[in-house]
Amino acid sequence: MKRIAILGGGPAGAFAAERLASAGLAVQLFDEKLAWEKPCGGGLTYKAYSQYPFLVDNDIPKRFVRETVLAAPRAGEVCVPLSDPLVIYSRLDLNRMLLDRAERAGAQIEKTHVSEVRWQGSAWEVRTPFGTADADFCIVATGARNSLRNLGTQLKAGDTMSALGYYVPGEQARIDIQFLPHLEGYIWIFPRCGHLSVGICGKGEPAGSLRKRLERFMSERGISAKGARFYSHLLPSLDASSWHENRVAGEGWMAVGDAAGLVDPITGEGLYYALRSADLAARALLSEKIGQYRRLLARDFAADLEFGSRLAKRIFLGRFLFGAVPARMVQFTRRSPRFSAIMQDLFAGRQSYQELKRRLLRNLNGSLYEIAMSLGFSRLVPRKAG
């Protein structure tokens, strides 16, 4: 029986463990902390739970969010109804559920620190404070702060973004997204079970500066940070030039989730890509087509994330029709049903970045017409003779 060592017990590692153990492989999962919280983590799109229905068909506490409010300077705000709701868990609860599923499938869960992983030519030696374990193959799921230098992606300074936030008492039904000037990122308010997650993510700006932006926003909204729990996390956010050299596999190993750099460079979403990459890695291993893993990732979603990395700066910092792109996005969503439908599909995960430009151009004339009509220009359009 093939022996598999999974290094990391987050969603990617836990799901890979379940998939491989269910197929009859001997799986050991090593993680120092196991289930833990993240600043915003726990949000699942329709794309995720439609492919993996167990993500909603369970008794774990969760929130179904059916509207998002987008806001930008000089544009006000707009409500985007979500026909396919976002599902929000406590990341702690979601991670614990995935680990429980892995254990029920037969995986051996080890709460311990991995001090060293050594390739012995035909097998791995995994060292922990309690001894060593041997494995024929390694799945690397150690997250963005991967201490195993020879395994997983190699993040450069420009390949990360900071995410930080507070858990504060409160209740609301919607998600708030606030764009800010000169920020390649955004502020969020996510409703959770029993509290709110108020946070910020941004690329190319120090965490201290992001925290000041967030606390200024919270003060303006009347949200107190006093006594609130603070969290921070590093997210992969690969530059366009980094995707082609992204190290996702090697002799005797594959990386999944954040450890493979597989995070949406625009939204910062990583949960779907953690689960999906774990699934694809398990398939490649079980079919003994490990060399095809990179190709499977590219065909499934990585090529789209690479394309998204080229769009990110233009979306957050670019200009269109003499205004900032985020402001135009809010205004177009408010005035154009066509554009609002595009935004809904983006939130659901149905709209790829590769097809986004074509869809926007295809709908541009119609969207501009709808905007003109909504602004009162219908009075200037001659009516057809009845």
Whereabouts are the PLM-identified features?
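C-terminal helical "tail/cap" subdomain of flavin- and related membrane-associated enzymes
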Residues: 283-386
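N-terminal Rossmann-fold NAD(P) dinucleotide-binding loop
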Residues: 13-14
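Glycine-rich FAD pyrophosphate-binding loop
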Residues: 21-40
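Beta1/beta-strand and adjacent pyrophosphate-binding region of the FAD-binding site
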Residues: 1-10
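A conserved beta-strand/loop capping segment in the N-terminal third of enzymes
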Residues: 44-97
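Hydrophobic anchor at the start of a short beta-strand
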Residues: 4, 25-27, 138, 175
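FAD/FMN-dependent oxidoreductases across multiple families
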Residues: 116, 132, 206-284, 290-294
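Predominantly flavin-linked oxidoreductase catalytic cores and closely associated redox partners
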Residues: 9, 101-228, 244, 261
